[in-house]
């Protein structure tokens, strides 16, 4: 077998063993293993398993691979020896744009560059040859211009249109999440910031393994970094008597003072049994998760889907039946338009109708009113109509705006109000969310928006002059944007006395809102609630899912179906699905013993219905259907059913006492979704669901002592448990106060989160050493993106890769791109792997979008390759929005072609503070904090044989472990260039560079050590850059001290404290 044939056979064998790519580094390692004389077949197989994931254990294949590697090693060793400069080992990648939907599989997106022929040179010094080999110039292919530009008008999908059942099965998470950024700011941008202009054009740096092993990065000690804090933060810390260590974050800092300034602990009593059970989670859920993994492994080994045997077994028919059932659901949910009389009758039955005149009178007499009303009182849909009828929208072209914390609420309420007013949606009544503006600037009088949209509108008009009345709905949810809006209006109302502000809330937080606005009057809409009996458990339950299932079965067996429906509160989707499955199993056991029932579908008096945000809208609709007492609905819901939904017929509530809360740790920059105890206010809201239509009963799966001692009075506001960098950048650009610390927060954020967010903005160049916005920061605030994403986009503009960066930033702004259906997880994993770009998840996302664009944005292509169609559509919308901003400034959008190192360095410029360094074979450690982290299993780097030494990541998430998500390999010199205040760099001397010892112990250095090579030059350049930043910090600090001294002297003169009779100077102490 020839040399080329042997190499092809090795690659074929490797493809049979694993789906991962055979990289040159991994191939070299395998050759070295095969060369060892004492390596037998078992040892070789074990070594291969340690290096990468394998899908086969066939010893025959491994034996063939071992022999081929031995022969290849011998051939390489007997070949002619040539001395030549090292070629560039970095792989060049090319996005494949010629894929066709008719092809069964994707071509590999990674194209290996053919090795150029080596040139013979004369023999030189061994050390000099090694240096030449390590630092030879990078061989670059010519970069063509952009192959394809994004068009505003997108190609229509000609080959396939999704059915309605497919559309409703798409992920609904985007519509149910908060709107953080809002719509496009059409204000024209000023010139490109000076910081972006002055950035050096990024040149490729050869990320050769030898170079990376020659230098090492280390975190700069905390004590040293504390000396490099910008003066405005040091001054703030000094004035507030807080340690400067909280500004930069330290996981080793455990003092009581620092703990009081850090994030709010989501557990009021962390040592209680109730809190411990929350941290452990449900055993039943964990057991189900393990069983599902075992079932999936069995399916993977014996899969018959889409085969002749699969058709015999009916697998394909089951999928078709599922589609039919989905279609049936869609038919059941067909919308109807009620008559005018029906609408009038429904509106008059609402509790708010009976107090209409008193409510409007109170609004006329006061600038701010707090309205308290339970879910179902009609405050959300009726209040805006009452104000419209009173003429608040007729004044000089002004309109009424209503904010909602969720997109789906803004859309649904706008549709309902338009139907009740019998006007077309988008005319008199409209809504505006990100990427959807269904309004008419001339005739829209009632506008429903997300709180993020209204917050972004303040950038265009800081007086909101076009609105006569603002309604902040569902304010008790205390979303971050709602809290910022409340602080903004507290400042604005003093300037606009004609503006009316109405805050609607459930009973929780109403007093706080009133006190915040100077004891504004409160108005309570009389409810129609009935008494609810609350029953606690006598002892703490060990498994809340098991206890909830048991209680639901008891209620159903002890009470007739006509007595009412059951609502079970759970923490999230996994808990809900486990409860759903376990309820079916338990009821089947009972009914099989009593009636001989063979399967759950034969039980005709129970309907179990889940409800959570990611569930398709048509399935969510089923919980509102009236079953007329023939069946009992058992609804399993998250806290979305506390206030956002009104479900008729609920008479029994089962409350597990927990919910999932997203918590941010500023010490390590970690977002984590944790199960925590609910608040007392949440518990009362849940219990109240049982008394909306008749007297009810609430079963609390915790003791009364737990309610009193382990639960906070109110839910922790989002502003006290989230990163504030984007919010603070927005407030800086609004310039509402001289200092951000003086902004009127209704609940102040933790001081550590506040200061660490400001430090992050300074670190990435958004604010200067005096705390003011830089030109770059001013431009960053114009983009509806997180600050780091805004920066990498602006840096990419200067470095000629803005076309690719537009796509990457857009893809990072949407939910999960890939999906794994339970019945086809192995197929989904294989399809996802084909998109992988080695050592970069960011470039993998770019690859996915480019492949989709090459296939005319086809939904059929997405379904075929297990890609979320709706996520890609959202990414395309975001990309168009950002492209419009760039084009309005006449900034060219340029492609870097094949040169992807430029893109990676631009990514590093915004995420240098989020870097990790490899330790051991497969683990990473956070380079700044020292926390051990792992690659997320969905990463393109996960399972690689040779992992890169340094990476940057987009997100750090904690589930069962600390995972870094969306990772890209970077050069250590890039990290030094953009993170020089966090890291130090050192050169590791090899054997030839080590000193030698003479006969009498004297040391002699190698003469070539004195010659400065490229690595030494780059190290010195990085340190010089850091020294210049430190010098600037010192100069600013000294200037501030001098200004303060002059100001004090001037004040003393004005106060008459300085006169000619000066006392003798005191002798300065010696210490």
Curated annotation (Swiss-Prot):
PANTHER family in UniProt: ATP-DEPENDENT RNA HELICASE (PTHR18934), PRE-MRNA-SPLICING FACTOR ATP-DEPENDENT RNA HELICASE PRP16 (PTHR18934:SF91)
Bias kind Polar residues: ranges: 133-154
CDD domains, sorted: SF2_C_RHA
Organism: Saccharomyces cerevisiae (strain ATCC 204508 / S288c)
One GO MF term attached to the UniProt entry: 3'-5' RNA helicase activity
Protein name: Pre-mRNA-splicing factor ATP-dependent RNA helicase PRP16
Domain of life of the native organism: Eukaryota
Gene behind the chain: PRP16
Protein purpose: Influences the fidelity of branchpoint recognition in yeast splicing. This is RNA-dependent ATPase which is essential for viability. It may mediate one of the many ATP-requiring steps of spliceosome assembly and that accuracy of branchpoint recognition may be coupled to ATP binding and/or hydrolysis.
Miscellaneous comment: Present with 1250 molecules/cell in log phase SD medium.
UniProt keyword list: ATP-binding, Helicase, Hydrolase, mRNA processing, mRNA splicing, Nucleotide-binding, Nucleus
Motif DEAH box in this chain: 473-476
Domain Helicase ATP-binding: 360-526
Cellular compartments per GO CC: spliceosomal complex; U2-type catalytic step 2 spliceosome
Major site of localization recorded for this protein: nucleus
